[in-house]
Amino acid sequence: TIYFNPAAMTQLSGVQVSAGVNALMASAHQTNRGSYRSVPGSTARVPVTGNDGGQPFESVIPVPNFYASAQVTDRLWLGLGVNAPFGLKLEYDDGFFGRYDSIYTDLKTYNIQPSAAFKLNDNFSIGGGVDVQYVKANLTNALPQVSPLVTTDGFTKLKGDDWTVGWNAGLFYTNGTTNVGVHYRSGINHKLKGTQTISGLVTPLSAANGEFDASAPLDLPDIVTVSFMHKLTPNLRAMITGKWYGWSSFKGIEVTSATGTTNKELDYKDSYSVSLGGEYDFSPAFTLRAGTMFDRSPTNPQHLTTRVPDGDRVWLTGGATWNISPAFALNVAYAHTWVEKANIIRPDSYFPSPATVTATTLAQTSGNADQVAASLTARF
């Protein structure tokens, strides 16, 4: 509630504290469709060979969360949320055919959200909060040598972090039978600062090896959420939620360092998701829920990358709440996600002319994901 619409905190009586974890189990597979590299001063195309990179995701990726709300008066609520709204971690095996595109990616965000909600009357509430967000990134990929006869690759590593502040606000309406929520979360424009390390390049590029101060912007999207819930019977509720993501603010990975500015164009598009679901109270102690969602990928088909092996997604979810006692509730959920196959055509150019080498990654990506979530809520 606090993260998705703090205005709905007015539906939480007393003091409530919830702590939980999402366990993400993702898989992806890359198939080489004829990747190649150029040779400076020639029109030749040299095949880039290698293995398929193996399973790039860890077997289980835990993502914790924490929320607390307190009813201060009959009209005022205060809350705090801590979560990780965006993240990605994957690593391909040594010798991956797409190594000039990506090898290792570790992006983490941590969001701390103090919030407040105010009940205007029995039907309407407003709420909002501040998003204090930390991001940390670590990205690596191989670098092609000028001569294709050199059997070893160069290597580049970029790491950086940043703290930035955003905001969010929402409106909540209820008449006891129908709930409607509208929420807006601002985009957050990070400016990561850290280092870029280049190693392994041989003559005539060996002078480029070294560690340099570097910076890179990271623009995370603004999000608009509209949700609707209606009681069909005293025990059965239907829900629909639509979200819009302003991902078009994310243009690519632009790194500025002493060696110059490089840009890996991604050109994300605005995206959306639509979910339908229902929940049924079998008893005052036990509630069962299920739903489905279509989630449009923001990735641009013209600029796909093995660093983000993504496509449109279809979700199928189920979950339950067990009210163990008036003071404690256990929430569990499971989701399976089907990810659409996509073809990657990724040309990336390295080094100034006349030593420019363009490595073109041609791949087909496919994958899916499972998530298991559990949380414990305490009421005081």
Q: How does the language model describe each region?
A:
Residues 10-29:
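Transmembrane beta-strand segments of Gram-negative outer membrane beta-barrel proteins
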